[in-house]
Amino acid sequence: MASQPAGGSPPKPWEKEGNTSGPNPFRPPSNTSTAGSVEASGTANPGEVVPPPVNRPNTAANMNSLSRPVPARPWEQQNYGSTMGGGYGSNLGMTSGYGSGTYGSALGGYGSSYGGGMYGGSSMYRGGYGGGGLYGSSGMYGGGAMGGYGGTMGGYGMGMGTGMGMGMGMGMGGPYGSQDPNDPFNQPPSPPGFWISFLRVMQGAVNFFGRVAMLIDQNTQAFHMFMSALLQLFDRGGMLYGELARFVLRMLGVRTRPRKMQQPPQGPNGLPLPHQPHGNQNYLEGPKTAAPGGGGGWDNVWGN
């Protein structure tokens, strides 16, 4: 063991000389073997056999040679990176984004959504928006907006058209074979021009006669209200004239006597008949002499 200098600090553990009296985790491994280092660290008992260290690069190489190979990343592929197409179709012959290939387009497989090819895009099994190909948009089973055999409304519809021959073109499904009522981009066919013109003429005629009928009705109501108001004016005017005439006659001393009450005709049960328009009318009387021993002619002026 090294001598301790006077007045100095004690030696550090790694400055001490190695001994075999017990486990020492700080023994320098340069002069010992792996087994000695493990034994010195206290992780193995004295005399225990420790396996030799493992060569990790060789082990990784052996594992890779014996196990399943790692597939190539998308960016490691040869045709990756052309707009949108290489990533999904490079192994199938893809060369462009929405474009062609042997079996597909940008989204690959049978009946791709965008693009053409031998079986892609508008293919035998029909994509959505693709171009032509060996079994293209007017192909054997094509002709639809969203896929399937014979278009979206099914059947062999329009899809049986130009691909297999004009003889089967419109026979299996007619012009409605490729229409989808749920597709907002697939509008129904427009009606003929003469039918649109006829409907516009009918609409104009109906609007014209409707306006004329409305004006006639409004004018009729206005005339009815005018005549009702005029009759009420005459009636109220007659009543006003009667009141004024009575007042003037009273001022002149002319007394009116009530009209003799006529017995209204009675019905079979003793009840008066309806609609008696001339009952209880007043007639004019001549001037009367003053009552004897009475007041002047102004007495009972406002009386009856």
From Swiss-Prot:
Record-level GO BP terms: fatty acid beta-oxidation; protein import into peroxisome matrix; protein import into peroxisome matrix, docking
- Record's family? Belongs to the peroxin-13 family.
**Organism from which the protein derives:** Arabidopsis thaliana
Alphabetically ordered keywords of this record: Membrane, Peroxisome, Peroxisome biogenesis, Protein transport, Translocation, Transport
Q: Compositional bias (Polar residues) spans?
A: 19-44, 56-67
Question: Gene name on record?
Answer: PEX13
Q: Identify the GO cellular component terms for this protein.
A: peroxisomal membrane
Q: What is this protein called?
A: Peroxisomal membrane protein 13
Q: Where in the cell is it found?
A: Peroxisome membrane
